[in-house]
C-alpha cells in the first residue's frame, strides 16, 4: 500500500518563513560588522604597504621623507604619492576601501594613482627636500599618514600641530568603527578612536 504524502499547511510555511526572517535579522548585523572589520584590515594593509614603500624611499633618498610640491603643483606634479609610487606601485593602496568619495582626476606624472584617501603630516612631508628622519625625535609617535577626507584629491599635508596624537584636524575620516587607521613614521600602523586622535 502506497502512503500519501501530506502537503505543508499554510501555518507551517508561515512559521518557517518567520524563523528564517528572525535568523536573517540576527545575522545581518554580524555580517555588516565583519565587512567593516575586513575593510579596516585592508586599510591597515594599505597603510602598511605605503609605510614599507616609505622605508625604501628613505633608504634611497639620504634618509629624507618624500617631499611635497608647492600648492600650485599639486595637480600637475602630485606630491608625495608620486614620490612613493616607485616603491608602492599598486594604485589601490592609496585608497581606503571605506572611502566613498568619488575619484578625482589628478595628473601624477603618468602614475596610475588617480585618487588618494590618506593625508600626510605636513611636518614630515614638507617642501623639498622632505624632512630628514634624524630631525624626528620619536619616529614611533609622529604621524605620517591618516585616513582623511581629501575629496579624492592629492593633498600635501593639512595636519595641525606637530603631527602627533591629539593634533589631527577635522579632515580625518572616521572610517573604521568610530576611529581611523594611522601610519606612523617608523612604519607601524595603529587604529585610534576619533577622540584620541583629535
Regions found by a protein language model. Give the residues of each.
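Amphipathic alpha-helical segments typified by the pilin-like N-terminal helix
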Residues: 2-45
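Short, well-structured segments within or immediately adjacent to enzyme catalytic domains
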Residues: 41-198
Amino acid at each position: 500500500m502506497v502512503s500519501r504524502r501530506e502537503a505543508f499547511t499554510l501555518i507551517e510555511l508561515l512559521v518557517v518563513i518567520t524563523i528564517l526572517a528572525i535568523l536573517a535579522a540576527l545575522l545581518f548585523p554580524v555580517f555588516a560588522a565583519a565587512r567593516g572589520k575586513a575593510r579596516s584590515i585592508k586599510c591597515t594593509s594599505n597603510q602598511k604597504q605605503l609605510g614599507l614603500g616609505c622605508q625604501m624611499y628613505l633608504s634611497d633618498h639620504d634618509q629624507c621623507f618624500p617631499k611635497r610640491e608647492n600648492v600650485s603643483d599639486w595637480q600637475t606634479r602630485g606630491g608625495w604619492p608620486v614620490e612613493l609610487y616607485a616603491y608602492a606601485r599598486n594604485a589601490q593602496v592609496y585608497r581606503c576601501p571605506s572611502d566613498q568619495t568619488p575619484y578625482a582626476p589628478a595628473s601624477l606624472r603618468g602614475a596610475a594613482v588617480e585618487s588618494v584617501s590618506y593625508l600626510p603630516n605636513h611636518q614630515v612631508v614638507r617642501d623639498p627636500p622632505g624632512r630628514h628622519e634624524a630631525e624626528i625625535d620619536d619616529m614611533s609617535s609622529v604621524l605620517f599618514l591618516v585616513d582623511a577626507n581629501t575629496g579624492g584629491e592629492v593633498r600635501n599635508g593639512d595636519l595641525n600641530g606637530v603631527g602627533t596624537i591629539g593634533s589631527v584636524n577635522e579632515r580625518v575620516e572616521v572610517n573604521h568603527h568610530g576611529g581611523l587607521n594611522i601610519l606612523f613614521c617608523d612604519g607601524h600602523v595603529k587604529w585610534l578612536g576619533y577622540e584620541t586622535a583629535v
